[in-house]
Amino acid sequence: MPFRPVQPEKLSSAVVRQIEQLILRGILRPAERLPAERELAERMGVSRPSLRDAIKTLQESGLLTARPGAGIYVADVLGSGFAPALTQLFARHDEAIFDYLSFRRDMEGLAAERAARLGSDTDLAVVQTVFDKMAAAHSKSNSDEDAKLDAQFHMAIIEASHNVVMLHMMRSMYQLLRDGVFYNRQVMFKQRTTRQALLEQHRAINTALQRRDAHKARDAVRTHMDYVERALRDQQEAQRNEEIALQRLDHETTG
């Protein structure tokens, strides 16, 4: 876990700042469990009473939450990013779906450009590692795993951009996607030709990043998001056509 001994001062305040910083930088993630009190106090080099004071402060600020019998967790602050009524409205209207994709195209293109310029070698190694997992999983045809790695790949790029506002904003957007608000990614990954195209697009993004070619990285992301939008429109049209065909079949067999 990413905790360091703190400098002597008011220890509880130093603990609060360190944990806040880890949450701000996206290192500690929503719903992640903190180590047990004894272990965490030892790692941070503070007394358990000082740690308790810090945890209490962070709970009162809404950044940490206690689960009875389970421990202390990072609060799911992203869950409150969109009101339930708004997420339901998003889900019911195609306009929101394609605005979401347009937003991602712009933001992730910028993130890729920043990652190529500003990301550390370690940042890019993380991106490479996730892509390697994507490539290895390609032969397994597991749409759930594909969708999970897809999200990890894009988030690794956003993390490598080192903009904490963008990081938390995009995490909130990805949470909506994981919840199936906009569209079902698993359906897209079940199509063989689409899966192959998506893998090659991710390869192009990764290659540009590893070469630190900011412009190509941005363009590769935009090409990828354009493809996702076209695939989704085709998927929706195919679904509408199937509904019409079923109505015709029902009419022919019962008429």
List PLM regions with ranges.
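Conserved amphipathic alpha-helical segments that form helical-bundle/coiled-coil interaction surfaces
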Residues: 104-183, 201-207, 216-230, 235
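Extended hydrophobic/aromatic segments used for targeting, binding, or gating
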Residues: 184-188
